[in-house]
């Protein structure tokens, strides 16, 4: 549904939330492994989405879904990293205990991107840094502009262009 089909921005936001809330929750829970923290992440992500609601063209489009899922994923990863930093400060001597406290690894499989890339390309993309992968996917999978990507990821347009250039170079080397 296009934004023009909604009478108010509030009804657009409500429809968008209803459409994606289950997947948003699943992504956040998959990364954080805590339902309460995931709820907070979904709320924080919705605030970011609301601030950028002008970027939503059709709530049922793949572009909108990837926009929403990328914000949720990045917000959850920010919380995870912050939590990890706090835990690192608590641990002073025993590194092996630290590994047991934070767990083995994050389950990124819950964030299945549907950018239209072949399996071979997805394999190459998996070798990139997370931010570079997001930039490549948003640029070539969704046709986002540098400005849209910079707004979404919270970095400058020049940084987007530089990261995109480096990511393409890295992909060419693979």
Language-model features, listed with the residues they occupy:
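A short, charge-rich alpha-helical start-of-domain segment used by transcription regulators
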Residues: 3-30, 36, 50
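C-terminal flanking helix
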Residues: 21, 25, 46, 129, ...
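Structural recognition of an alpha-helix C-terminal capping motif at a helix-to-coil junction
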Residues: 26, 40-47, 51, 62-74
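Arg/Lys-rich amphipathic alpha helix in sigma70-family domain 2
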Residues: 70-91
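Short helix-coil-helix linker/hinge
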Residues: 115, 119, 125-133
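DNA-recognition helix of helix-turn-helix
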Residues: 124, 141, 147-174
